[in-house]
């Protein structure tokens, strides 16, 4: 399953997900992007301490689901009613593939990516 709102998913990422699930090692696969940002929750830093503020590159590896690609077995949907298994295969994608259009600002960003990287005159 890919979403029209994630227009830059590559064939290579799709193939990785399909291969992982078809191999039988995983019931599902989905795209993720590494998030190296200072995160806060309930007024407190979530992934660092104020006593030791690291460089963003040194923050712990945290991944965000990109909503760009989901591959799963029919058994997973039928038996558990969901698209992500307990042990999913994570397909790490770059920032361009991770682009997901949910609002006007996202569309402006996607349009700029398209015009910069993919548009042929």
Each predicted region: which residue ranges?
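Hydrophobic helical membrane-anchoring modules
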Residues: 79, 91-92, 97-121
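Conserved core of the sugar-phosphate nucleotidyltransferase
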Residues: 4-94
């Amino acid at each position: 399953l890919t979403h029209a709102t994630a227009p830059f998913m590559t064939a290579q990422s799709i193939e990785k997900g399909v291969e992982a699930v078809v191999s039988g090692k995983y019931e599902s696969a989905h795209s993720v992007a590494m998030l190296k940002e200072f995160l806060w929750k309930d007024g407190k830093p979530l992934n660092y301490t104020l006593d030791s503020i690291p460089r963003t590159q040194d923050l712990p590896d945290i991944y965000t689901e990109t909503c760009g690609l989901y591959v799963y077995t029919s058994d997973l949907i039928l038996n558990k009613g969901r698209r992500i298994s307990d042990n999913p295969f994570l397909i790490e994608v770059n920032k361009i593939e991770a682009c997901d259009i949910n609002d006007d600002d996202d569309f402006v960003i996607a349009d700029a990516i398209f015009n910069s990287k993919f548009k042929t005159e």
